[in-house]
Amino acid sequence: MITKQQVLEFLKNYDLENITIATVCSHSSLQIFDGARKEGFRTLGICVGKPPKFYEAFPKAKPDEYLIVDSYSDIMNKVEELRKKNVIIIPHGSFVAYLGTENFAELTVPTFGNRAVLEWESDRDKEREWLLGAGIHMPGKIDDPRDINGPVMVKYDGAKGGKGFFVAKTYEEFDELVDRTQKYTIQEFITGTRYYLHYFYSPIRNEGYTLSEGSLELLSMDRRVESNADEIFRLGSPRELIEAGIRPTYVVTGNVPLVARESLLPLIFSLGERVVEESLGLFGGMIGAFCLETVFTDSLEIKVFEISARIVAGTNLYISGSPYADLIQEDLSTGRRIAQEIKEAVRTNQLDKIIS
């Protein structure tokens, strides 16, 4: 992985009065570009082949310029061009997935956030070590599929938008559905309501909900719309569907907004705080936007089944603010909050604390 010192050497040649915010044209890029523009930054969209036509329909979020590449791996050959434009990369889930975690770790362009989190986020065993070390309640993990004796969720490593995930109740069902060519994790299936909690950790702000270093914000929350799981039971009971050879799938197709009971906010903040504090000790901290993927049970317990250590697509619901972000600042999206962090770091000469 590129070292922090190498990144700081690149920054010495940057014109910090003319930073360009860049990301791949996908996932949450409209929100990122809109937020960057609101904070006065130039924007650059990276795309394969030609610029997406639909960007013309959203002039406020259309980037100021595009970098056209032959393939996403070709980004690695454009690093000097990006650095000449004083680019800071904003990674989102698709950026990392398309470029590949190894390439992303070696990308010689200053990047918002701490790339060291990749080692802990992309490996489900290390992710579990991190969350359990933070005192987070997680679904039980089953190491041997022959021990399955009730509903479990089987997930593959990496950001796949839920593709290929499945529920099994027996070893036989698991054996029928699993793709053994991929690394997988088997988790106890928790009944309850799914909440995806969108946080922002700043190592350079020391006001609001403060931690041992910096501060934590809760910007929004959502629930994912999954195909075909969210509509399939219109066709019949689970038993009838299985008899018909139809099984639920969990591909994310969109998001719906949520708020939580106000009495749950102390626990929600506590979860975010514990995860950040643990990250500070493990790898120097998880910087910027992150999401805890949770289930709220009927006993009002919150179980965390995964973490996404960057901006998530569910924040796209709130380009003009959310019920929580509006109580911090009107018209505050996660994309805009990222731009504010960069702007503040430049102003206070603290870019080294938020860039890797």
Swiss-Prot record:
A GO molecular function held by the record: magnesium ion binding
Q: Output the Gene3D superfamilies linked to this UniProt entry.
A: 3.40.50.20, ATP-grasp fold, A domain, ATP-grasp fold, B domain
Q: Where is the ATP-grasp domain?
A: 101-333
Q: Which organism is it from?
A: Methanosarcina acetivorans (strain ATCC 35395 / DSM 2834 / JCM 12185 / C2A)
Residues given in the record as Mg(2+) binding sites: 293, 306
Which HAMAP family did the record assign?
IMP_biosynth_PurP (MF_01163)
Q: In which pathway does it act?
A: Purine metabolism; IMP biosynthesis via de novo pathway; 5-formamido-1-(5-phospho-D-ribosyl)imidazole-4-carboxamide from 5-amino-1-(5-phospho-D-ribosyl)imidazole-4-carboxamide (formate route): step 1/1
GO terms (BP aspect): 'de novo' IMP biosynthetic process
Instruction: Kindly state what the record says about how the cofactor is bound.
Output: Binds 1 Mg(2+) or Mn(2+) ion per subunit.
Q: Which cofactor does it need?
A: Mg(2+); Mn(2+)
Q: Which residues bind ATP?
A: 145-196, 226
EC class: ligase
Q: Which UniProt keywords apply?
A: ATP-binding, Ligase, Magnesium, Manganese, Metal-binding, Nucleotide-binding, Purine biosynthesis
Protein name stated in the entry: 5-formaminoimidazole-4-carboxamide-1-(beta)-D-ribofuranosyl 5'-monophosphate synthetase
SUPFAM superfamilies documented for this protein = Glutathione synthetase ATP-binding domain-like, PreATP-grasp domain
Binding positions (5-amino-1-(5-phospho-beta-D-ribosyl)imidazole-4-carboxamide)? 27, 94, 255
Highest taxon, organism lineage: Archaea
| Keyword Nucleotide-binding appears in the UniProt entry | yes
Catalytic activity, EC: 6.3.4.23
The entry assigns this protein to a family as follows: Belongs to the phosphohexose mutase family.
Give the catalytic activity.
5-amino-1-(5-phospho-beta-D-ribosyl)imidazole-4-carboxamide + formate + ATP = 5-formamido-1-(5-phospho-D-ribosyl)imidazole-4-carboxamide + ADP + phosphate
Keyword Nucleotide-binding in the entry? The reply is yes
